[in-house]
Amino acid sequence: MDARERLIVGLDVPTIGEAEKLVSTLGDDILFYKIGYQLVFAGGLEFARDLAASGKKIFLDMKLLDIDNTVASGVENIAKMGMSMLTLHAYPKAMKAAVEAAAGSGLCLLGVTVLTSMDAEDLADAGYSQDPHSLVLRRAGQARAAGMGGIVCSAAEAAEVREIVGPDMAIVTPGIRPTGSDHGDQKRVMTPFDALKAGATHLVVARPIVKAPDPRDAARAVLNEMVGALWPANR
């Protein structure tokens, strides 16, 4: 995969019109888009289908979690939509049900470990006794055991996660901030170059591109950082 196949731009905008404008602005530079709750609830599912039909890859970031049958039913329908990736929370029973439901569809299921906006204090407030690092590694192992296609984690854990999940699973890392950019609400961040070096296969970048004065220039800057990490001489 080259850099364009590894960069996922988060369409974190409130309206379909804004999303369409952004996709048009980015043009052929960007092949992969993430669509989450904000856009889904503004009519984004139909938009996602249209983007997929136009040749773009779509990461549907729904973070599903429910009883097994409900998760399986949802995944079965999403698998028919032409999406490339789908997230669900990395709970063993839900993951196993989803894997069975998506079998043969080509949909890559991603287990969400710990949100990159959360730190140890946040987990403690939510009732978890484990620190983020330990919980990420535990859930990565559970995702592998369930047969998931990949996991979502911060780039800070990517190297150790790779040791746990082996060479074939995708490691998708949000919380990516280009060199010199503001961290925003993210607490566990890394640059595109360092994230790929750490073992990530795909990088999710939203605000540094979406909110940039020139989104296309910002996207190209991220791609250039990624190329630096992927170039054989730097491996």
From Swiss-Prot:
Catalysed reactions listed for this entry: orotidine 5'-phosphate + H(+) = UMP + CO2
UniProt source species: Rhizobium leguminosarum bv. trifolii (strain WSM2304)
Keyword list, A-Z: Decarboxylase, Lyase, Pyrimidine biosynthesis
GO cellular component terms attached to this protein's record: cytosol
Keyword Lyase: yes
Pfam families reported in the protein's UniProt record: OMPdecase
E.C. numbers: 4.1.1.23
Protein task: Catalyzes the decarboxylation of orotidine 5'-monophosphate (OMP) to uridine 5'-monophosphate (UMP).
Residues involved in substrate binding: 12, 34, 61-70, 116, 177, 186, 207
InterPro entries named in the record: Aldolase_TIM (IPR013785), OMPdecase (IPR014732), OMPdecase_AS (IPR018089), OMPdecase_bac (IPR047596), OMPdeCOase_dom (IPR001754), RibuloseP-bd_barrel (IPR011060)
Active-site feature positions: K63
Top-level enzyme category: lyase
Protein name: Orotidine 5'-phosphate decarboxylase
Gene: pyrF
Domain of life: Bacteria
Binding partners and assembly: Homodimer.
CDD domains in UniProt: OMP_decarboxylase_like
Family listed: Belongs to the OMP decarboxylase family. Type 1 subfamily.
One annotated GO biological process: 'de novo' UMP biosynthetic process
